[in-house]
Amino acid sequence: MYKELTKYKSTNHFSFTPEDQLETQCNATEGSGVFLVYECKGEEKQLIMVGSTGTVQNDGTLKSKNGGLFDKIVNGHQFAKTGRKYSWPSQMKLEKIEALEVHWFETFGGKLKVIPTYVEGQILQNYLNEFGSLPKWNVAF
């Protein structure tokens, strides 16, 4: 796990296969934060995507889309102009990915107010430093 994520207490993870329904497997909250997607092959896990949700406004308040992390993971668009609940299973079959493990972290709430895209950027920068590229499902940042 990335050290930037150890301070967040509202966190969990879930597994997902192409046969599962993402909306029933996803246990993320409606809070704002980041999520990391790992490709699982046996005991090995490889980070393949980092995402976030929630925008901090000029006055320091958070603008969050309805549904927060849960909605971003399940209904956010990726690979097509359609929600991940449809595109992830298709992409997993195409790439012969057996399972995904999704870890999510609320970064903005209560006393802790860390901008979700800042945390996303930190993790992506660390990945870039280590591997020389972004995770394969991150198109750009």
Sequence positions of predicted segments:
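Boundary/linker segments flanking structured domains
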Residues: 1-48, 52-141
